[in-house]
Amino acid sequence: PDRLRIDEVASDGATDLALFDGKQITVLSADENVYAQAPQPPSIEDALVYFVRDLRMRAPLSLLLSTHVRTELPALAKEVDYVESTQIRGQTAHHIAGRGDSVDFQIWIAEGTSPLPLRIVITYKLEQGQPRFAAEISDWNISPKFSGNTFQLALPKDARKIPFAVQLLAP
């Protein structure tokens, strides 16, 4: 696929949208009524790498979408430990923790025939204050059906286009 939609709600209630429509990447901050756009590389995997590496945007769960997760994860995590078997929303899950040079992570993976992530916590060790990203993931649908407008951008009235921050730094 060449399309992806990420709807984010921050802990303060602010909402953001990252839309990869196959031609361009759009990030919209609805609360601030601003958006930024950049051309999208052809595949979602390449687009996510570009989004994180070149546009310097955060996409904490992007590694889960990578076909190279098995080779990339060992480079990020210098140490991985099995913590325990526990319950997440009534479902048995395996709690795994990893430590790396720049990030620490914890992931809870469902036990059984559908070993999908149920909870993820990522700590950015090199950033000021060591911020954490936490996600509770439920209602997995691995065979979704999308409506025609899922990947169409509907900008709010009077939304203002701004550059990505990294574009301001370019010579």
Language model features: what each stretch is:
Residues 11, 26-27, 75-164, 168:
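Gly/Pro-enriched, hydrophobic low-complexity segments
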Residues 42-79, 83:
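Solvent-exposed helix/loop surface patches that form functional interfaces
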Residues 1-59, 129-133:
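An acidic-aromatic
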